[in-house]
Structures are given as C-alpha cells and as structure tokens.
C-alpha cells in the first residue's frame, strides 16, 4: 500500500515538473500594458541577435493570472532555435545531481518515517501469557463445590 502511495507521489511530482517546464505563468493587472519575452537565437553565421516578442493583453482578456504556453521562436527555415543557457555545464550537472539527491533523500526520509510509524514500541507489545495457566490470577479463593460436599 505504501509503495502505491510513493509511486503516486513520484508520478504527481513528475507531472508537475513537466507542466512547469512547458507552461509559463504571467501576472496581468489592469495597469499592465505588455509582457515582453526575450529569446536569444543564433543566426546562420553563428552570431547572436536578440529577438523581442511582446504580448499585449486586450481589455476583455485581462485577468489576475493567465497561463499560456510559450514556444521558442522559429527561424525563417521553420526550425526551432535552441535557447541559450545561463549556466555552464558543471553548474547544470551540479543542479541535476542536487535535484536527484533531494528527491532520493525525500523518498528515503518518507520510507524511514513510515517504518518508524509501523514499528511497535516495546511498551505497546503485550506480554505473552505465562505457561503456568493452572493457577488462577485472582486473589479471591473460590470454594470448590466438589470438596465441600464431603
């Protein structure tokens, strides 16, 4: 049962991470006029240029929170352009290993907590009955009717 719970938690985390990576949340208020997205794309001669795309909310589309999917711009050839990363390779590697260690540590911590909750403490365990069951445990002596008739 706990394995199923952990599986569902891991699956929901994967879904939420993939949802965050494909969507972007933009805050719009009535005073905001535009949301600007900048992408760095490479030209054919390997020099970089900055493309700016502005999205202006219309008066009837203004909301507190709107979720929209933002795709990278396409070049004239119709191919998508890879975005430039702000981190170097060692930093990205450390980030990935850090996230992996965090997820594995969380799973181990949850399983340790579950094991501690399932395990009974020695005070909760009832003692085994004594092998000498002939002797009654009450302090009141009961008269035996067979011996009283004599």
Curated annotation (Swiss-Prot):
Phosphoserine, modified sites: 138, 148
Pfam families noted in UniProt: Glycophorin_A
Positions of glycan attachment: 21-23, 29-32, 36, 38, 41, 44-45, 52, 56, 63, 66, 69
Outcome after substituting residue 84 to P: In ENEP/HAG antigen
Result when mutating residue 82 to K: In ENAV/MARS antigen
Modified residues (Phosphothreonine): 133
Post-translational modification: The major O-linked glycan are NeuAc-alpha-(2-3)-Gal-beta-(1-3)-[NeuAc-alpha-(2-6)]-GalNAcOH (about 78 %) and NeuAc-alpha-(2-3)-Gal-beta-(1-3)-GalNAcOH (17 %). Minor O-glycans (5 %) include NeuAc-alpha-(2-3)-Gal-beta-(1-3)-[NeuAc-alpha-(2-6)]-GalNAcOH NeuAc-alpha-(2-8)-NeuAc-alpha-(2-3)-Gal-beta-(1-3)-GalNAcOH. About 1% of all O-linked glycans carry blood group A, B and H determinants.
Entry membrane topology: Single-pass type I membrane protein
Segments on the Cytoplasmic side according to the record's topology features: 115-150
Mutagenesis or variant effect for residue 46 to E: In Ny(a) antigen
Residues making up the signal peptide according to the UniProt record: 1-19
Cell membrane is among the record's keywords: yes
Subcellular compartments: Cell membrane
A GO-annotated cellular component: membrane
GO molecular-function term, one example from the UniProt record: virus receptor activity
Disulfide bonds: none
Main location, first listed in the record: membrane
Regions crossing the membrane: 92-114
Domain of life of the native organism: Eukaryota
Reported effect, residue 98 to L: Diminishes dimerization
Keyword entries, A-Z: Blood group antigen, Cell membrane, Glycoprotein, Host cell receptor for virus entry, Host-virus interaction, Membrane, Phosphoprotein, Receptor, Sialic acid, Signal, Transmembrane, Transmembrane helix
Record family assignment: Belongs to the glycophorin A family.
Subunit record text: Homodimer. Component of the ankyrin-1 complex in the erythrocyte, composed of ANK1, RHCE, RHAG, SLC4A1, EPB42, GYPA, GYPB and AQP1. Interacts with SLC4A1; a GYPA monomer is bound at each end of the SLC4A1 dimer forming a heterotetramer. (Microbial infection) Interacts with Streptococcus gordonii hsa protein.
Function: Component of the ankyrin-1 complex, a multiprotein complex involved in the stability and shape of the erythrocyte membrane. Glycophorin A is the major intrinsic membrane protein of the erythrocyte. The N-terminal glycosylated segment, which lies outside the erythrocyte membrane, has MN blood group receptors. Appears to be important for the function of SLC4A1 and is required for high activity of SLC4A1. May be involved in translocation of SLC4A1 to the plasma membrane. (Microbial infection) Appears to be a receptor for Hepatitis A virus (HAV).
Note: Involved in several unequal homologous recombinations or gene conversion events, predominantly with GYPB and more rarely with GYPE. The resulting fusion proteins are observed in different phenotypes and encode low incidence bloodgroup antigens.
Designated name of the protein: Glycophorin-A
UniProt organism field: Homo sapiens
Lineage: Eukaryota, Metazoa, Chordata, Craniata, Vertebrata
Gene, per the UniProt record: GYPA
